[in-house]
């Protein structure tokens, strides 16, 4: 292990931290607007902090949606989700905020967000939020 001193650059945010901090959900045009189909996205490494203890909370997020005019771009979604890692926020609030942002940015016909939080203190929690009307 090196014992070299670190320079001032350790005080500035690293490039990855800057990218995450500036992230937003980006969408692109649905390549087949006439077809009804579902897209499923898994984000297994979601983290935020408990607003009471400051301890990290971990969850697996699953998004299933029927796109309308646009589709979520996956890298931007990953970076947007990573932005919550240092935020002190309740499970209920963070999942509702994510759903609001997904609906506002992508305007899907229908969307379901499931957040399965890892157990802490022998208690686990799962939230399911739906928006829109599912089409067949």
From Swiss-Prot:
Subcellular location: Cytoplasm
Pathway annotation from the record: tRNA modification; tRNA-queuosine biosynthesis
Single GO cellular component term: cytoplasm
UniProt xrefs under InterPro entries: GTP-CH-I_C/QueF, NADPH_dep_7-cyano-7-deazaG_red, QueF, QueF_type1
Active site per database record: 50 (thioimide intermediate), 57 (proton donor)
Binding site for substrate: 72-74, 91-92
Alphabetically ordered keywords of this record: Cytoplasm, NADP, Oxidoreductase, Queuosine biosynthesis
Catalytic activity: 7-aminomethyl-7-carbaguanine + 2 NADP(+) = 7-cyano-7-deazaguanine + 2 NADPH + 3 H(+)
MF annotations from Gene Ontology: preQ1 synthase activity
Superkingdom per UniProt: Bacteria
EC numbers, comma separated: 1.7.1.13
GO biological process, one term: queuosine biosynthetic process
Function per UniProt: Catalyzes the NADPH-dependent reduction of 7-cyano-7-deazaguanine (preQ0) to 7-aminomethyl-7-deazaguanine (preQ1).
Family, per entry: Belongs to the GTP cyclohydrolase I family. QueF type 1 subfamily.
Protein name, UniProt field: NADPH-dependent 7-cyano-7-deazaguanine reductase
Annotated organism of origin: Prochlorococcus marinus (strain MIT 9312)
Gene: queF
